[in-house]
């Protein structure tokens, strides 16, 4: 359309100037040439306009695409931000082993421990036992898992495979009824006392004090509750027996166990005061009990003091416990009385034991951890691998046990123990112990029938857990 108008205008101009007259014939060729040039210029202009229009369309299309992409990016960023606000479906944390936790409240964590012991116990003159002298063993090899279930529930299942077999240790379900009240059903520890309830991972010596091993403390099947309010902890439960012993359908034992703890902060220190009470009905017509203890270490299967079997219908135990932690220093001690009720008019003996212990960290900034009425995991201030040497602790313990009463002469012991504990990182420990034990009226006679003698024991342990 634009070219046609220009052509008509050009013809009109030519006619007005006399382009059609015969006198101007000589100029026709020049005019025609000019018109041709004008047409070429107009065609070029039209082509340029078409090109610009095409480029404009392309630019519009690109702008639209950019706007669409920007909108998509904005939407994607908003979605990512919203997703970031929501917890991951499954989170993984590391606490010695991976712990898997879901947004719905489930969690699962494998757990285990390995304790390898070696040691030697001297042999009094005249006593020959292959268990004395040097020995070594895998003291514990636990494998299991624990976790949480939505609704305030929790669980733990664990076995010990150290002794060429499988022994169930913990196997229970928990319920946190409120912030203060927790319930447990299944196989777990009754509430004996401070050292017994403290995990063997966190002990001061390789073995617990004699009073905590002589009277048959063990995990039992039962139902229990723990109430905590401020500085006070109240624990109680009803138990039968260890699940392995319940394979005997004649085992009808039933016990009631309770413990109260008062644990206030005193200045810069943590105080622990407690007491426990235990009553157990054996519920068997031919029932008996036996109290005895190894010489400081677990490697020898020999007991220098031993009551032998005592016919019994029930047991009554009661104990006191105390502890204090301030900075690198700790002190703790327990006493326990165990009374045996015998059938008919037989005399009811009462046996007694206790220990007193002090300890000190030699490394700066380290302290014995305390939590929920028991001693807890030591976390070195300067662990190996982070520029430090870990935590080093020295412990001293006096250990007493009296198994003589009511006509039963099982012997007495006075033990003097020293231990060195090195914790390079919180999940690994190395322990070295020495114990000197003096026996009177011992169960095993030495040369010439002598029942008053002493033994020395040295033990070491390497352990890790996860």
Task: Locate each region found by the language model.
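Sec/Tat signal peptide C-region and signal peptidase I cleavage site
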Residues: 19-25
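Short glycine-enriched, charge-decorated loop/helix-capping segments at active-site entrances
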Residues: 38, 127-132, 446-449
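N-terminal periplasmic/intermembrane-space "pro-region" immediately following the signal or transit peptide
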Residues: 25-115, 362, 366-379, 466
């Amino acid at each position: 359309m634009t070219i046609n108008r220009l052509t008509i205008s050009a013809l009109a101009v030519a006619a007005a100037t006399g382009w059609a007259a015969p006198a101007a014939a000589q100029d026709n060729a020049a005019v025609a040439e000019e018109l041709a040039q004008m047409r070429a210029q107009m065609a070029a202009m039209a082509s340029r306009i078409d090109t610009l229009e095409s480029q404009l369309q392309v630019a519009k299309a690109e702008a639209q695409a950019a706007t669409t992409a920007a909108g998509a990016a904005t939407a994607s960023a908003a979605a990512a931000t919203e997703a970031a606000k929501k917890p991951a479906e499954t989170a993984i944390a590391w606490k010695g082993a991976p712990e898997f936790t879901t947004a719905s409240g489930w969690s699962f964590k494998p757990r285990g421990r390995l304790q390898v012991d070696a040691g030697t116990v001297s042999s009094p003159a005249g006593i020959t036992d292959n268990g004395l002298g040097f020995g070594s063993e895998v003291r514990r090899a636990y494998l299991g898992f624990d976790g949480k279930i939505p609704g305030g529930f929790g669980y733990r299942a664990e076995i010990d495979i150290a002794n060429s077999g499988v022994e169930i240790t913990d196997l229970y379900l928990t319920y946190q009824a409120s912030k203060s009240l927790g319930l447990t059903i299944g196989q777990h520890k009754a509430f004996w006392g401070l050292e017994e309830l403290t995990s063997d991972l966190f002990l001061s010596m390789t073995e617990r004090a004699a009073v905590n091993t002589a009277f048959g403390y063990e995990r039992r099947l039962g139902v229990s509750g723990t109430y905590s309010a401020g500085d006070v902890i109240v624990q109680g439960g009803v138990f039968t027996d260890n699940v392995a012993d319940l394979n005997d359908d004649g085992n009808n034992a039933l016990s009631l166990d309770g413990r109260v703890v008062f644990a206030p902060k005193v200045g810069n220190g943590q105080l622990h005061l407690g007491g426990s009470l235990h009553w157990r009905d054996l519920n068997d017509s031919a029932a008996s009990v036996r109290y005895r203890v190894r010489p400081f270490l677990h490697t020898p299967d020999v007991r220098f003091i031993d009551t032998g079997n005592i016919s019994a219908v029930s047991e009554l135990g009661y104990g006191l416990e105390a502890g204090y932690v301030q900075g690198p220093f700790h002190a703790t001690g327990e006493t326990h009385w165990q009374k045996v009720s015998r059938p008919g008019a037989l005399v009811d003996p009462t046996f007694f034991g206790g220990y007193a212990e002090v300890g000190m960290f030699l490394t700066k900034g380290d302290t014995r951890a305390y939590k929920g009425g028991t001693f807890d995991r030591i976390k070195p201030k300067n662990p190996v691998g982070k520029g430090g040497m870990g935590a080093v602790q020295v412990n001293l313990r006096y250990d007493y046990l009296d198994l003589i009463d009511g006509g039963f002469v099982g012997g007495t012991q006075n033990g003097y123990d020293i231990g060195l504990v090195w914790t390079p990182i919180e999940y690994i420990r190395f322990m070295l112990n020495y114990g000197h034990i003096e026996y009177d009226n011992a169960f095993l006679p030495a040369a010439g029938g002598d029942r008053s003698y002493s033994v020395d024991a040295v033990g070491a342990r390497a352990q890790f857990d996860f």
